[in-house]
């Protein structure tokens, strides 16, 4: 941070520090930068979080209100914003007091009140439901206050997803040419970019018909009550009706075709091998791309026109139409992007994964279509590498298996003039400070042996807890299912376990720190997100337990399509996909232990494949050099498996 600030000041640029997720972002914003301000008093910094992390003051006022008139107004605006019970209303009233008195900045992560996801979804908003400058609360809105601060800040803390969205829309952040961009935990960037560019949309025929009918009525309302100066040709009722009718017929045809690929009347998924659509489906997608883009343009034209009429019309009626048109624009934008991507055979020189899903909610069937590129190097080149002059990508795991090749393939980065790939030696003496322990497990951590393996793991873990050699411990799992199984085996130790999901991560870490500093034993238990950005030094963390080598899931449509493509190129998917990803994960997990010259301890890895498989040695060679020990494991008898088998057999008989 300090060199970045110095260079940014010298070059008169804005330093943007981006990290992998909101938790790491908030750590820099709430802890690291306030600490730096003590030695750089005039430092101006802020954070750029996504809109969904901020409270919407309009929604908060409605949910905190007990006034019927407020609810009547929101009903007219088509917003169902009423508290479910008195406790919710009181909580919202308290939050409003905190916001109004500046005790809270409106960011979900910065309140000590527990807000469940259901309530927060109504307290926050999204782009489609935001009135923007037309909102009565615009000036004091936490989201827009934070956005205005960005223009004055020297340092902006962001996350990769927000940076990608900002570069795509050319909004939020200063101009790319005026940035010094640092991408921390940069190994996540290709995956984040791929997720950001994934397009999904509902295409259920009856639902689509309803949306088109509502849009036609909305356009008619605009033409009648808020007529623009020049009438768009597509706003002509007959032309718009014909346009929407053609669009619906294509959607209905697509539904019929997709239903042939999926078992009738139940939840299902169909992936198109290598992303290759039948010719008939490809032609439908190409036509849908054109038709939805025209509706997107019409909605955008009306929205811009409506935004200029706020001073000359009934504000409540206008706001209602603005909200509805904004939501219509959001829908047609998504549809247009989806069908454009579906119409492509390749993106960044690789296939586009395409699949359809059918889900059943409340007895109703919904059909969705999804597209995502396997590679996003062209998009990263356009949005980042070519547009921002100075970028630093950092991470403990830019290399996997001691090579930059996976990063280069996924990100499109190459050794060009002025670009450098640098691997720095660790300043720590791992041989003296720690060791790796691979217990002599009887079972490999495969799905068929999961119950026995976790029972063995729990027995060894219990032995370590009872030895009382370590105050601070961390247990990392590859899946939530395995974590919950483990917790069933150690119910008597539950009070000392701080488990992911019990509270927000930063609160669990604070509680862990307090416990250890007061001489109590404390164990953090979590998934892969706990393996990154967790900085606990010395006695705060002296033993890390790793459930198994974390290979990526093999049932993802993207992973399966990439595997097909690699095989078509005579490449081995395990070598290109699975092993580098597992190496990334293992390096991050092991890296939690030694964080300073005063750190010490052990990393326990419950996976004997590190010693028995050929790839195990390669994974170990990519780690810091620790001594390796192989102690025995207490013998355990697993009875649960037999019971489960009996139950399953009983179910089959019925």
Label every PLM stretch briefly:
Residues 12-15, 19-154, 217, 223-235, ...:
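A substrate-engagement module of RecA-like helicase motors
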Residues 14-21, 392-396, 471-478, 604-606:
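Conserved RecA-like ASCE P-loop NTPase motor core of nucleic-acid helicases/translocases
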Residues 23-26, 30-34, 127-128, 134-155, ...:
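Signature of the SF2 helicase/ATPase Hel1-core->accessory helical subdomain module
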Residues 121-154, 164-173, 301-442, 453, ...:
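A contiguous, basic/glycine-rich beta-loop/short-helix subdomain that forms a polymer-engagement track
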Residues 382, 439-478:
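Conserved interdomain hinge at the start of the Helicase C-terminal
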Residues 439-451, 502-611:
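Conserved RecA-like P-loop NTPase helicase motor core
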Residues 478-502:
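Conserved helicase motor "Helicase C" RecA-like lobe of SF1/SF2 P-loop NTPases
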Residues 604-654:
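N-terminal targeting/trafficking signals and adjacent low-complexity tails
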């Amino acid at each position: 941070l300090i060199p970045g600030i110095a260079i940014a000041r010298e070059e008169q640029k804005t330093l943007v520090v981006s990290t992998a997720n909101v938790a790491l972002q908030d750590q820099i914003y709430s802890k690291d930068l306030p600490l730096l301000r003590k030695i750089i008093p005039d430092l101006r910094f802020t954070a750029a979080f996504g809109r969904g992390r901020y409270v919407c003051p309009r929604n908060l006022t409605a949910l905190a209100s007990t006034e019927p008139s407020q609810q009547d107004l929101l009903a007219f605006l088509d917003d169902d914003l009423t508290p479910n019970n008195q406790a919710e209303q009181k909580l919202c009233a308290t939050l409003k007091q905190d916001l109004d008195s500046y005790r809270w900045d409106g960011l979900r992560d910065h309140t000590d009140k527990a807000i469940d996801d259901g309530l927060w979804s109504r307290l926050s908003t999204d782009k489609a439901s935001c009135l923007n400058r037309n909102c009565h609360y615009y000036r004091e809105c936490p989201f827009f206050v934070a956005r205005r601060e960005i223009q004055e800040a020297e340092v902006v803390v962001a996350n990769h997803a927000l940076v990608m969205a900002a570069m795509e829309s050319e909004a939020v952040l200063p101009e790319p040419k005026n940035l010094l961009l640092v991408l921390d935990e940069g190994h996540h960037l290709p995956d984040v970019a791929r997720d950001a560019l994934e397009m999904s949309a509902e295409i259920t025929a009856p639902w689509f018909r309803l949306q088109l009918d509502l849009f036609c009525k909305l356009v008619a309302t605009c033409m009648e009550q808020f007529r623009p100066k020049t009438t768009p040709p597509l706003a002509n009722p007959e032309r718009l009706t014909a346009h929407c009718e053609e669009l619906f017929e294509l959607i209905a045809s697509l539904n019929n075709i997709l239903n042939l690929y999926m078992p009738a009347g139940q939840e299902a998924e169909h992936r198109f091998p290598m992303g290759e659509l039948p010719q008939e489906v490809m032609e439908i997608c190409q036509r849908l791309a054109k038709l939805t883009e025209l509706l997107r343009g019409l909605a955008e034209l009306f929205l811009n026109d409506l935004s200029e009429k706020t001073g000359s019309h009934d504000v409540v009626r206008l706001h209602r139409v603005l909200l509805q048109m904004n939501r219509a624009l959001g829908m047609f934008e998504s549809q247009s992007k989806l069908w454009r991507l579906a119409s492509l055979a390749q993106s960044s020189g690789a296939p586009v994964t395409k699949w359809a899903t059918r889900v059943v909610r409340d007895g109703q069937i919904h059909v969705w279509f999804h597209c995502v590129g396997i590679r996003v190097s062209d998009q990263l080149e356009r949005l980042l590498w070519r547009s921002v002059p100075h970028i630093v990508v950092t991470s403990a795991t830019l290399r996997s298996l001691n090579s930059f090749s996976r990063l280069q393939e996924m990100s499109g980065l190459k050794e060009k003039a002025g670009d450098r790939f640098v691997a720095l030696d660790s300043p720590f003496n791992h041989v003296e400070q720690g060791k790796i322990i691979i217990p002599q497990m009887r079972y490999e951590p495969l799905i068929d042996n999961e119950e026995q393996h976790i029972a063995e793991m729990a027995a060894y873990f219990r032995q370590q807890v009872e030895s009382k050699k370590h105050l601070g411990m961390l247990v990392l799992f590859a899946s939530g299912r395995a974590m919950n199984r483990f917790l069933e085996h150690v119910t008597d130790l539950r009070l000392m376990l701080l488990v992911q999901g019990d509270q927000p991560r930063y609160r669990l870490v604070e509680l862990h720190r307090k416990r250890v500093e007061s001489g109590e034993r404390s164990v953090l238990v979590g998934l892969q997100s706990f393996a990154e950005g967790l900085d606990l030094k010395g006695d705060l963390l002296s033993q890390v337990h790793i459930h198994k080598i974390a290979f990526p899931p093999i049932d993802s449509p993207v992973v399966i399509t990439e595997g097909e493509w690699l095989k078509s190129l005579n490449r081995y998917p395990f070598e290109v996909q699975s092993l580098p990803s597992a190496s990334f994960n293992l390096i991050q997990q092991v890296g939690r232990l030694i964080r300073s010259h005063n750190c010490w301890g052990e990393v326990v890895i419950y996976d004997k494949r590190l010693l028995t498989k050929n790839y195990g040695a390669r994974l170990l060679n990519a780690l810091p050099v620790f001594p390796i020990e192989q102690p025995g494991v207490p013998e355990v008898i697993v009875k649960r498996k037999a019971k489960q088998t009996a139950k399953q057999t009983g179910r089959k008989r019925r």
